Amino acid sequence: MKKEIKKLLKNSPLYPFLRSTKRTLRIYKEYPQKYGVSPIEALKEIEVCKYDAPYILKKATIKNQGIGDFFYSLDHSIVVEPKNTIIHNMPVDYDYVTNLELGDSVIENSIKAYVKRINDPRVTLEKPHDLKSALQSILLWNSLLWQTGHNLVGLGRLDKVLAKYPIPEDAEELICDFLKTLHCEYTFKSGVLKGDTGQIILLGGLDENGEYFCNEYTKLFIKCIEKIHLPDPKLLLRCSKNMPKELMELSMECNATGIGSPLFSNDDIVIPKLIDFGYEAKDAYNYGVSACWEPLSIGNSLEQNNLANVEYGSCMHQVLVDEKLSDCSTFDDVLNVFYKKLEGNSIQIKTGLDRIVWEDDPLLSLMMGLKSDIAQGGAKYNDYGILSVGMSAAVNSLLNIKKFVFEEHKYTLKDVQKIVLDNYQDSADDFSLFSENANGYGTESDEAISLTNKIISKTETFFKDYRNKFGGKVKFGLSSPGYLMIGQNCGATLDGRKAGEAFQTHISRDKGEPLTEIMNFESKLKFTGTSANANVLDVMVPSSLLKDNVDKFATYMMAGIKSGIFQLQMNVLSYAQLVDAKAHPEKYPNLIVRVWGFSAYFNDLPEEYKDHLINRAKQMEHIN
C-alpha cells in the first residue's frame, strides 16, 4: 500500500465500510473533500481476505501501537470479508481468557506462533500476576479478535475481572494508558459511524446475594475515563437501589464533562427480566451488554442483539395511507389495523433471522471454552436480539386519532389520511395541533402509558414462540441506532413528524420537561424477558445545569433507579455550542456528543446527525 494512502486511510472511515456489505457510501458522500482521496482509489489499495484466523495471524504485520508500557498491534492492510456472518457485538469473559492454557489445536498453535513473532517480553501467554500483566493480557486477546475481523468487541466487567489483583501505586497511570491503547485504533474499529466501536466496559452490579459489588477499580475506571476525556472506550455502570450514592455522584461528575459515560443500567429491573427470559440466575447476575446496551450472558452465549428492527413508526405510516383506514368505525378498529401491520413486520423479521448463516469461529469458540463451534450452536445460550424504532410516533399518532377523530370529531379518518399523504403541506394549524402531544409518549399520562404497554404486550405475542435453528429465543427492546436512517425512508406520521424526519431517539421526549417525568413514564412500562433487549431512556441535559447540580442529578438518578427505570444515557450539551461547532468546526476539535449508544467527536459526524442533535438541543432548551 502506498505510504500516503495508508496514512490517509488510518484516519478515515473506509475500513469500517469494508468490513460489512451493510455499510453504505452515502454516509461518506464528502469523503474525497474530507480525506483527500476518493473511495474508489482507496479501495484499490486494500487487500480483502476471507475469514481464516490462523492465516490472518500468520500474515499480519506486527508493529507496536500501544501507549506507555503496553503492547498492541493491528495490521491495517488486512480487512476481512467473510463468506457468512461473523459473530461479534459481544464481550468475552476476560477472567477466563487471560487464564487460558493453550493446547495443540490449529488455532491454539497459530496464537502461540503469533505471540512468538511479537517477540516482546511484555506479551506472554502466561497467567497474569498483577494489574499490569492482566491489562496487557486483555489487550493481546482483544487485538486478536479485532485483527481477525470481529467488530464491536466489548470488554466485559473489568472491575470484577481485575478484583483479584492488588492496586499498585501507578494504577491510575496504567489504566489510563490501557484505555488510550484501546482508543488508538479508534477509526479502524469504528462501525457505521466513526466512534461506533462497541468498546464498552461494565462496572459494578448486584451479586446473587442481592449485595452491590463495586471496588476501587470501579472508581478508578470512572476517574480515568473522565481524565483522558476521549469518546471511546465507554462505560456502563450497573446500578441498584443498594449502590453507594457517592458512586452515582462520581458517575454524574464524569457525565458532566460531556463524554457520555457512564450509561446506567438498573440491575433491580434487568436481572429479573433476564431470568424470566430463561437465563440461569448466576448468568443473569453476571450479565454484560452488546456494543451499546443490549443485555447478554458474558462468555457463554452466541447472543447477537442487533439483528433487525421492529418498525413501529413505519407500521403506523402504513396504517395512515391504507385505503381501508376510512372503513374503521372505532378506535379499536384502527388499533387492530396497526397490529396487523406490526404482525407483518414481525413475520418479515423472523424470516430474515432464519436466513442467517454464521461463520465458523474457532478463535471465539476457544475463548469461550466451547466443545463445539459457536457458529454451530455450541454456546450455552443461542438467543437472538432485535431492536425497535418509532414507538413514540406510533403511540402519539394513535392517541391523536383517538382524540381528534373519535372523541372530539374535529377530523375524519379521510382528513387525517390526506394530511399525512400531503406531508402537512399548507396545514400549519394541523401540524401544530398534531405536534403538541401534550399527554403523549414520555409523559405521565395514564392513557399514553397504557397504550405503550398494550403495544409492547402485542409485540411480545408475535415473538415469544420464535425459536432459531439452535433452539434459541428472541428478545426485543425499545431502543435502536436506526431512528434517523429508518426515519429517512418513512413517510409522515400523525404526531407532527414529516416524511423523512428522524424518529424520537430511544425512549425520549425532547420538550424540556423535568427529568423525573420521563423517568416516571419509563418506570411504568411493563417489560418482560421477551422485551428486555435494551430499553434506554435517552435524556438531553444542558451542560451548565448538570455541572452546577451534580448532587441533585445523582439524587434524581437514585430515585429513578428505585422507581424502576430500565436503562438511561445522558447527552450533556448546549444548543448554542452545537450551532457554533457546526459553523466553526476548527474551534471545537474535541467536542464530544452521545449518538445512539456511543460517543463521538461532533466534527466526525455526518451533517444529518449534527442537525439531529442540534434540533433535539433546541427543543430541550425551548428555543424558537
Label the predicted regions.
Residues 1-120, 124-624:
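Conserved catalytic cores of very large enzyme subunits
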